[in-house]
């Protein structure tokens, strides 16, 4: 166990040592790279400072040369380019020797150095502490969008150091791989020899001169980016067209292969070759249409409303949905309240009215002489009548016929009293209860009496009860609320006058305080009494 623990400890120590060495090497490489970068920056700074010290009197000349190269003033730049082109072709076409050209160049440099103090002012420069700062570039006479002398010196220094680095790498590659270096140099020289054989050297020199003159213009105005922006749509269109043509050729090639595989035997006639696809292939692209579904979709589409019709219905208070029936909204509720009952409601009211008459038709023995009804029978009849009235109120619309306001309060002379007794013999409770029935109960019968011929009403509408029967039937609270809303209240004087006209004396039992006095008998009430009399006359024989 101890030995195994020792082995594990040794393995852990070895791995830790390897990890430490790896980290040390990485840190050493990072430190070496940082030191190299710092040394390169220091070398660039020293070279830029030395160049700036030598060119500190040429700031104006360098600024003018930059303005000419970037074509800031097109006329001056055009004259300069024409002059340089003329000199180049003059020297190339002359028969002068190279030594003569070299001597002329040295003489020109000597004259410029001699005449510099007279024609070009001496511009004093600040001490070269930070030659690459913007403030010094602005004070050196250059424009803000052009390179100042310190910036130009810095770019030149960086270019020179980059060239030196590449030269050192090339020499190192030559020492390490001499055979590869020799092969590459020989291939490069052969390419230049072939190019010089087909293209004259003077033309190559002219191309180099034009590149030096036009390259600052291209970089300064970003002509390459602008040209690419304008040519990009054309290039994309060309690319798509080439892809389409390649796909078409590939498709034709595949088609020919398939036709070659499916070729008929030698005895059969060859089929006609066409550019279109076969019917089997084209049938795969055509959709399968169901006739029934298509007809149903067309019918639904034809039944839909147009946008104009939908807007008209919506403006009139109808909520319109596509392929549905227009429905009334809350805006048209006032129209429903003012409109007459519809045909289904009238039919329902007729059926309920007929059913009530049929159910309430008394037998013959009850029409002859009204026997004394017990209290229990009266309660049963009262509950049945209340249920039927509630059913009529729920099923039929509410109609109000104010015919009791048209009469003068007294019966007409031509009206005959029923044989069972005159109208005065009826108890005021029965008369008031019968005449003050809810409008929902009397509305179907009154509508039928006014619209069509007079029909015989059952005696249950106006029952002829004896005077001494204690039938002070009290209506439900809902009936009292309806009668209170439908009829106006009468004062005590009018109530006494009506009692005197009806022949009711003070010996009559007092009325309940909640029951209203009977309204005056109008023509409708007389018609009801007459119909009751005719019913009795028909039953008695």
From Swiss-Prot:
GO terms for molecular function: endoplasmic reticulum-autophagosome adaptor activity. The chain crosses the membrane at residues 75-91, 99-115, 199-219. The keyword Signal does not apply. It is a multi-pass membrane protein. Residues 250-260 have a biased composition (Basic residues). GO terms for biological process: collagen catabolic process; endoplasmic reticulum organization; reticulophagy. It is found in: Endoplasmic reticulum membrane. InterPro entries: ER_autophagy_membrane_reg, RETR2_RHD. Interacts with ATG8 family modifier proteins MAP1LC3A, MAP1LC3B, GABARAP, GABARAPL1 and GABARAPL2. Interacts with CANX. Endoplasmic reticulum (ER)-anchored autophagy regulator which exists in an inactive state under basal conditions but is activated following cellular stress. When activated, induces ER fragmentation and mediates ER delivery into lysosomes through sequestration into autophagosomes via interaction with ATG8 family proteins. Required for collagen quality control in a LIR motif-independent manner. This is Reticulophagy regulator 2.
């Amino acid at each position: 166990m101890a030995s195994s623990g020792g082995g594990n400890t040794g393995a852990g120590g070895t791995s830790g040592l390897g990890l430490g060495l790896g980290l040390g090497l990485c840190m050493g490489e990072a430190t070496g790279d940082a030191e190299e970068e710092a040394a390169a920056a220091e070398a660039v700074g020293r070279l830029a400072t030395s160049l700036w010290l030598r060119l500190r009197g040429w700031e104006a000349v360098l600024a003018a040369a930059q303005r000419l190269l970037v074509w800031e003033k097109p006329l001056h730049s055009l004259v300069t380019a024409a002059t340089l082109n003329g000199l180049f072709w003059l020297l190339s076409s002359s028969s002068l020797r190279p030594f003569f050209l070299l001597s002329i160049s040295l003489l020109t440099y000597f004259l410029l150095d001699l005449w510099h103090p007279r024609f070009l002012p001496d511009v004093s420069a600040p001490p070269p502490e930070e030659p690459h700062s913007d403030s010094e570039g602005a004070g050196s006479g250059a424009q803000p969008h052009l390179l100042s002398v310190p910036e130009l010196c810095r770019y030149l220094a960086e270019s020179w150091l980059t060239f030196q680095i590449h030269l050192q790498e090339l020499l190192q590659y030559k020492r390490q791989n001499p055979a590869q270096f020799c092969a590459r140099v020989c291939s490069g020289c052969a390419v230049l020899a072939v190019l010089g054989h087909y293209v004259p050297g003077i033309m190559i020199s002219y191309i180099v001169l034009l590149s030096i003159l036009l390259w600052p213009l291209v970089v300064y105005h970003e002509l390459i980016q602008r040209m690419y922006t304008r040519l990009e749509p054309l290039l994309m269109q060309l690319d798509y067209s080439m892809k389409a043509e390649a796909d078409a050729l590939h498709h034709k090639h595949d088609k020919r292969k398939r036709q070659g595989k499916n070729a008929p035997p030698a005895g059969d006639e060859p089929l006609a070759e066409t550019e279109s696809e076969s019917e089997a292939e084209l049938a795969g692209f055509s959709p399968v249409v169901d006739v029934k579904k298509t007809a149903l979709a067309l019918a639904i589409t034809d039944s839909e409303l147009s946008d104009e019709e939908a807007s008209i219905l919506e403006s009139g208070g109808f909520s319109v949905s596509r392929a549905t029936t227009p429905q009334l909204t809350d805006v048209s509720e006032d129209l429903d309240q003012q409109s007459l009952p519809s045909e289904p409601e009238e039919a329902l009211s007729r059926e309920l009215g007929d059913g009530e008459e049929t159910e309430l038709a008394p037998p013959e023995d009850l029409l002859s002489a009204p026997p004394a009804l017990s209290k229990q029978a009266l309660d049963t009849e009262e509950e049945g009548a209340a249920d039927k009235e509630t059913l009529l109120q729920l099923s039929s619309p509410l109609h109000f016929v104010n015919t009791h306001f048209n009469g003068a309060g007294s019966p007409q002379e031509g009206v005959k009293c029923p044989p069972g007794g005159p109208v005065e013999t009826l108890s005021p409770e029965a008369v008031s209860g019968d005449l003050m029935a809810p409008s929902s109960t009397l509305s179907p019968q009154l509508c039928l009496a006014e619209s069509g011929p007079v029909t015989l009403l059952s005696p249950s509408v106006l029952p002829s009860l004896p005077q001494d029967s204690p039938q002070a039937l009290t209506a439900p609270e809902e009936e009292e609320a309806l009668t209170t809303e439908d009829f106006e209240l009468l004062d005590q004087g009018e109530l006494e006058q009506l009692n005197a006209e009806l022949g009711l004396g003070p010996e009559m039992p007092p009325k309940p305080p909640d029951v209203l006095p009977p309204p005056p008998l109008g023509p409708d009430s007389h018609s009801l009494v007459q119909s009751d009399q005719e019913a009795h006359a028909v039953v008695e024989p």
